[in-house]
């Protein structure tokens, strides 16, 4: 639903803003929530209508955000700053919509693509720092806002169900891709099993570690704040590290048709790992360090099988621009995993070198 400007001014009046509102305009290119920039004769703000189709439990979502941001602020970290409603709540239900306001973080930039290893190293530092400052936080306090989000065995069961149904008869056109995921079935439970038996610690995980969720200082280029905290959940930090490697250490876009352009860059892997481990070295466990290289494989396989399951089901989840779009995405993910497997000894050596240097 598109709100009128008059409606938006009325919605903004429910929040304890400093200064008179002078303008409200659409902001950013996010696809989940609807976001506006609020200008006043004082500070600027971000006004958001939350997507309750994807996140139906607004109460616990905002509770998660409040718990994590208050913990970070107590340690002097810059983070999202929730602006309360005029009645002191963290969000408001207005005309059937769920709304919230954050203070706008000024003098920052963000990137959609990795421009160079230095920026990716800084991204690693930002998410390592995020993990480090929350290392003593009891992640079991958090609610799972999207069930089974990085539960790879559960995703594999979803994939097998889509394959068994094959409701559009597409399986015959992608048998090599199907065989790839079936042949790796013994790898999918490694992290979930570790979380269950305690060999991998339960931590706060961000679960959407795209580069554009880091605000960097416009002058120094240093990371200032991690944003988009809606998918904050309990899990393994290997989820965040692995997904960062999946998208950031690739030389091509996720839907590149020409697989000769798709490569796994160990240079970018090293850069991110240097930043991440450099911040987290005080709390990373030996088992987590051992699994850092594999986490890239795991999260890339998980994402690829989700693309393939969606292709088999008729493209009902991921937005597509042409009939084979999800299959193309699947193939890029498989190519990345194949190169990760080929370079496994190199990435293990990189992690060992960085861990040794960080001692």
Swiss-Prot record:
Optimum pH is 8.5. Stable at pH 5.0 to 9.5 at 30 degrees Celsius. Residues 21-359 form the Protein kinase domain. Its cofactor is Mg(2+). It catalyses: N-acetyl-D-hexosamine + ATP = N-acetyl-alpha-D-hexosamine 1-phosphate + ADP + H(+). Belongs to the protein kinase superfamily. Phosphorylates both N-acetylglucosamine (GlcNAc) and N-acetylgalactosamine (GalNAc) at similar rates. Involved in the lacto-N-biose I/galacto-N-biose (LNB/GNB) degradation pathway, which is important for host intestinal colonization by bifidobacteria. Also accepts GTP and ITP as phosphate donors. In vitro, can phosphorylate several GlcNAc and GalNAc derivatives. This is N-acetylhexosamine 1-kinase. It comes from Bifidobacterium longum subsp. longum (strain ATCC 15707 / DSM 20219 / JCM 1217 / NCTC 11818 / E194b). The gene is nahK.
